[in-house]
A protein has these predicted regions:
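N-proximal low-complexity "stem/linker" segments adjacent to membrane-targeting elements
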Residues: 2-57, 62
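C-terminal catalytic/acceptor-binding lobe
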Residues: 11-13, 162-249
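Anion (oxyanion) recognition and catalysis
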Residues: 44, 97, 207
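Residue-level detector of anion-binding/catalytic polar loops
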Residues: 49, 85, 102, 212, ...
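Residue-level recognition of beta-strand->loop/alpha-helix junctions
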Residues: 54-56, 107, 217
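Active-site nucleotide-sugar/metal-binding loop of Leloir-type enzymes
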Residues: 65-78
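Conserved catalytic core of nucleotide-sugar-dependent glycosyltransferases
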Residues: 68, 89-187
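Short beta-strand-to-loop acidic/aromatic patch adjacent to the donor-nucleotide binding site
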Residues: 76-87
């Protein structure tokens, strides 16, 4: 598949701009950097405007809030979150851009002690009656933010709907520009005995504001840890088979 040509064919008229944001704990996996080099090459060849921003923090929710604020200071059309331990091909980003949805993610396997486990952190309204849309899309309630594409208009509406989410005082504020307006759109939550991560918090917030969330089920991602957890979300809708999909790094 000639990804660069496809980018050109689809976006030559409006050329969406992309702000790639990567929360980092203490490092970036080499597999992720190779993937980034691939997507940078394709975006450059297509003539699309983009930039890459990183944020080093042990608190992923905090890093996502800072990266979102930096995105809103710019004028790009899309915010693309890419976690620092994901391996992907450019076609994954291409599929999400082509879909032109307000919020779209590509799910990846959860790291577990069992490399054969194929668990995904995705919530669907009716898992027994999943409607696969054209382009390999599925509407979901929430999904992981490690590979998530979000339109600027989503955040603009969230700011209007939830002005109280603005963070007035935050740690290390002297290290950020005074005009950086940070909103708590990403946060962990604990309710009715259940703890949820910052991506579920964001998805719930967005859905309350009227947005729909979609998952790209046709792209294969590798979630790197002690093992490389390779998987395509669409395979979870197929009959189960025996086998191991984890490879030791």
């Amino acid at each position: 598949m000639m990804v660069a040509a496809t980018f050109l064919d689809v976006f030559v008229m409006n050329k969406p701009s992309i702000h790639i944001a990567m929360p980092c704990y203490d490092s970036v996996k080499i597999h992720t950097m190779i993937s980034m080099l691939k997507i940078v090459k394709e975006l450059t060849m297509a003539g699309l405007k983009f930039e890459l921003n990183t944020m080093k923090s042990p608190y992923v929710a905090y890093a996502r809030n800072i990266l979102t604020a930096r995105f809103l200071q710019r004028d790009e059309d899309y915010l693309l979150f890419v976690d620092s331990d994901l391996e992907f091909e450019p076609e994954c980003v291409l599929k999400m851009l082509i879909a032109q949805k307000d919020i779209m993610c590509t799910p990846y396997r959860v790291k577990t002690n069992d490399p054969a486990s194929t668990k995904y952190t995705v919530s669907i309204e009716d898992p027994k009656n999943v409607k696969i849309l054209q382009g390999g899309l599925v509407e979901i309630n929430n999904g992981p933010a490690g590979m998530m594409l979000i339109k600027r208009t989503v955040f603009e509406k969230l700011i209007k709907d939830y002005p109280e989410k603005e963070i007035k005082v935050h740690p290390n504020e002297d290290t950020f520009p005074k005009d950086l307006r940070i909103y708590n759109f990403w946060d962990c939550n604990f309710k009715d005995g259940t703890w949820t991560g910052e991506d579920i918090y964001f998805c719930d917030l967005a859905r309350q504001s009227g947005f729909k969330i979609y998952a790209n089920i046709d792209s294969t991602l590798i979630h790197h840890g002690s093992f490389g957890y390779k998987g395509k979300y669409g395979d979870s809708f197929k009959p189960k088979t025996n086998g191991t999909n984890g490879t030791k790094n």
